[in-house]
Amino acid sequence: MCAERLGQFVTLALVFATLDPARGTDSTNPPEGPQDRGSQQKGRLSLQNTAEIQHCLVNAGDVGCGVFECFENNSCEIQGLHGICMTFLHNAGKFDAQGKSFIKDALRCKAHALRHKFGCISRKCPAIREMVYQLQRECYLKHDLCSAAQENVVVIVEMIHFKDLLLHEPYVDLVNLLLTCGEDVREAVTRSVQAQCEQSWGGLCSILSFCTSNIQRPPTAAPEHQPLADRAQLSRPYHRDTDHHLTANRGAKGERGSKSHLHAHARGGAGGQSAQGPSGSSEWEDEQSEYSDIRR
């Protein structure tokens, strides 16, 4: 639940954070030519950008971050791949042997896949972005991101910066994957992002505080620790039902007892009515009155 909330929150933050920069770009840096203007309006990578990226990919090697730099500053606004690559390389020395192997293999996997898939994809920006992020996820999973994160939790948390989540979608994808890597990794990432969010946005990060409190709270409370108000609310229906059954049982028993008592007196009255005289008639009227009260 908390993982879903955090993922939705950072995605929503990413959307709001990109509104103003996008509006500023349109007003201060208009497209230079009709071709670029039409490409941006249709959501396509311009022919010039396509040629530049293809040329860059041919000259870039599999080692390092050269391939990812080819996707910076394009009309589809695919950014963050180069930054996340540099972040991994700068922190590689802090990882253990398994973590270092993951960084080398994952970056090489992404570079190789981007070079071979880019020429086969449509120039539509949504298709290119989906291809880029899908390849990134596949390479992370193929080379076991979770195992590397579980053995290097502190380093992974240090790599995640809240401002990157607001500006670059590859970081959001990375965090969403880390949130599926077990409770220790998920809790560490959530706390780190929450603390950084509170420094930047203050009270707007209360949703993350609620999420973290849910992680720390036991799933169910013991009966003896339930609030008194809750126990009172729970006990009221029970008492009402119990009182209803007791009243019904008493009424039924009283009715049956009164009937048997009445029949007994009727038989006795038939046998000795002449001997009782006025007192017998008075007792009979009293019993009739009690019987009527019970029936009411």
UniProtKB/Swiss-Prot annotation:
Query: Which classification does the entry list for the species?
Result: Eukaryota, Metazoa, Chordata, Craniata, Vertebrata
Q: Which UniProt keywords apply?
A: Disulfide bond, Glycoprotein, Hormone, Secreted, Signal
Q: Name one GO molecular function term.
A: hormone activity
So what family is this one in?
Belongs to the stanniocalcin family.
InterPro entries, sorted: Stanniocalcin (IPR004978)
The annotated subunit structure for this chain is:
Homodimer; disulfide-linked.
Please, which domain of life does this record's source organism belong to? Eukaryota
Keyword Secreted: yes or no? yes
Biological process terms from the Gene Ontology for this record are: calcium ion homeostasis; cellular response to hypoxia; decidualization; embryo implantation; endoplasmic reticulum unfolded protein response; intracellular calcium ion homeostasis; negative regulation of gene expression; negative regulation of multicellular organism growth
Q: What is this protein called?
A: Stanniocalcin-2
- The reply to whether Disulfide bond figures as a keyword in the UniProt entry is yes
Subcellular location field: Secreted
What tissue expression does the UniProt record report for this protein? Answer: Expressed in a variety of tissues. Strongly expressed in ovary and to a lesser extent in kidney.
The protein's job, in short, is: Has an anti-hypocalcemic action on calcium and phosphate homeostasis.
Sorted alphabetically, the Gene Ontology cellular component annotations on this record are: endoplasmic reticulum; extracellular space; Golgi apparatus; perinuclear region of cytoplasm
Its source organism is: Rattus norvegicus (Rat)
Glycosylation sites per record: N73
The segment annotated Disordered runs over 22-44, 236-296
The signal peptide annotation in the UniProt record is 1-24
Biased region (Basic and acidic residues) positions are 238-258
Coiled coil ranges (UniProt) are none
